[in-house]
């Protein structure tokens, strides 16, 4: 039986007086791609920020490999093997591609940096071609690849991705999702937050639907892909 890598246990998260995430619980098992889908403002990004240690739940808990990471600093969570690809990419614009990748490896032994970088360059040949280019001069799609590559540099067991298709052309969206599939084949477990519900459900094993801060549906991704309520609300069908 696959190990439960991540367990979100009945968390409640507030922004001031705004109750953004309400009694949310779900699990991500080793080897899975799990997706959270929902409209803008549903609480998806807030949930990911809570998992990554950028926000703290008022009640409830977040467990990684069976241990609570509630209140643990974000960089310690990365050291434990849980990396994030944030919404909007957030690459270091005035640093080169290679320097950005090196920043992703700050928690790793020096001996692992070169082999991990080669793994990234195999996944993203364009990054290898542009390794000396400033990140700020790259296209949005290239910056997204760099953000994903930087996460891989920390040798994670689990990567949480926040809206990786945001702002990208349809062609680049296809490319990014293809790369997510390849990352999964390399043994990386993935928690994916994505507004493009059709693409997310097509690639995921399981899915949860967030509405107004609550999980309203869950199940196999293929089942939800063909569910009439999901199709009407999120797939334009």
Which sequence ranges carry the predicted segments?
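Glycine-rich phosphate-binding loops of nucleotide-dependent enzymes
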Residues: 2-237
């Amino acid at each position: 039986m696959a190990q439960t890598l991540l367990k979100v246990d009945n968390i409640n998260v507030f922004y001031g007086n705004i109750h953004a995430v309400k009694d949310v619980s779900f699990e991500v098992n080793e080897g899975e791609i799990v997706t959270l889908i929902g409209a803008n403002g549903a609480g998806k990004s807030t949930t990911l920020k809570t998992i990554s240690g950028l926000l703290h739940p008022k009640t409830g808990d977040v467990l990684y490999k069976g241990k609570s990471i509630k209140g643990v600093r974000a960089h310690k969570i990365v050291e434990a093997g849980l990396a994030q690809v944030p919404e909007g990419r957030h690459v270091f614009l005035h640093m080169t591609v290679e320097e950005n990748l090196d920043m992703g490896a700050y928690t790793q032994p020096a001996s692992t940096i070169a082999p991990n970088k080669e793994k990234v360059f195999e996944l993203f040949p364009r990054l290898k071609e542009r390794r000396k280019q400033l990140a700020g001069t790259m296209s949005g799609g290239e910056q997204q690849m760099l953000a994903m590559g930087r996460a891989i540099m920390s040798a994670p067991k689990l990567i949480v991705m926040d809206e990786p298709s945001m702002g990208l052309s349809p062609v680049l969206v296809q490319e990014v999702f293809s790369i997510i599939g390849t990352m999964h084949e390399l043994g990386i477990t993935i928690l994916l937050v994505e507004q493009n519900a059709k693409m997310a459900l097509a690639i995921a094993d399981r899915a949860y639907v967030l509405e107004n801060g609550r999980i309203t549906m869950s199940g196999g991704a293929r089942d939800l892909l063909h569910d009439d309520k999901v199709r009407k609300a999120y797939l334009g069908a």
